[in-house]
Amino acid sequence: MPAIEVGRICVKVKGREAGSKCVIVDIIDDNFVLVTGPKDISGVKRRRVNILHLEPTDKKIDIQKGASDEEVRKKIEEAGLTEYMKERIKIKIPTL
């Protein structure tokens, strides 16, 4: 089970969307993936993200590589994960 794969639900840990959940839609290269919220569910816009800024969860939805936001939204609703996707995670910054 690879951690970074199409359909994997992740939490963004860096940036203005830190704490929001997103879905990996496409793997661009070894360092970057394409993610989406979709925006109306979790607030994450479709964009390229460094994999070091993501924390994978144990949940995965069955989508095709490059799926549209509508397809992702439908699969999230079918899996019953809408409320899970709307939850925000509190990111803890380690202190020295």
Curated annotation (Swiss-Prot):
Keyword field: Ribonucleoprotein, Ribosomal protein
GO terms classed as biological process: ribosomal large subunit biogenesis; translation
UniProt KW Nucleotide-binding keyword: no
Any GO molecular function: structural constituent of ribosome
Signal peptide: none
Cellular component terms per the entry's GO annotation: cytosolic large ribosomal subunit
InterPro entries registered for this protein in UniProt: Rib_uL2_dom2, Ribosomal_eL14, Ribosomal_eL14_arc, Translation_prot_SH3-like_sf
Official protein name in the record: Large ribosomal subunit protein eL14
Organism whose genome encodes this protein: Saccharolobus islandicus (strain L.S.2.15 / Lassen #1) (Sulfolobus islandicus)
